[in-house]
Regions:
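RNA-binding basic/glycine-rich loop and surface signature characteristic of RAMP-family CRISPR effectors
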Residues: 1-126
Length: 126
């Protein structure tokens, strides 16, 4: 069982397309929640991206990668990893603006969802 929680804010510096089913002519649609149709990034994909980046940074003989994320696919049933990622929610979205190039837009619903998730992880003020 996990004993500590941390909230992370992710910022995309390039366009993002999550892997999910192709729909018609669009072959890389954004993954969405079924019940709200809001964009979402699966925690498993975030964990895989973080693991991949650390794999490139850590020396090959360093065992921390397996301790943090679990064994690779050959030994996946040996033990679980020490970290877990939940799904990421979209809070701000870049929108083209005639006066400023781009601005970040949000909604009361997106802010309320973010506040609720942060409170669940123990953050009381923001």
């Amino acid at each position: 069982m996990f004993t500590a929680q941390k909230s992370l804010f992710l910022y995309a510096v390039s366009p993002i397309h999550r892997v999910c089913q192709a729909i018609g002519l669009i072959d890389n649609p954004i993954q969405r929640e079924v019940h709200t149709n809001h964009p979402v990034f699966a925690g498993s994909g975030i964990k895989g991206a973080v693991r991949h980046r650390l794999y490139a940074l850590l020396p090959k003989e360093d065992n921390r990668l397996n301790r943090y994320f679990g064994a690779d696919s050959q030994g996946a049933s040996d033990y679980a990893g020490a970290v877990s990622f939940s799904d990421a929610q979209l809070v701000l979205f870049p929108v083209r603006c005639t006066k400023a190039g781009y601005v970040y837009a949000t909604s009361p619903l997106a802010l309320a969802r973010a506040k609720r998730l942060l409170q669940q992880s123990g953050l009381t003020t923001w």
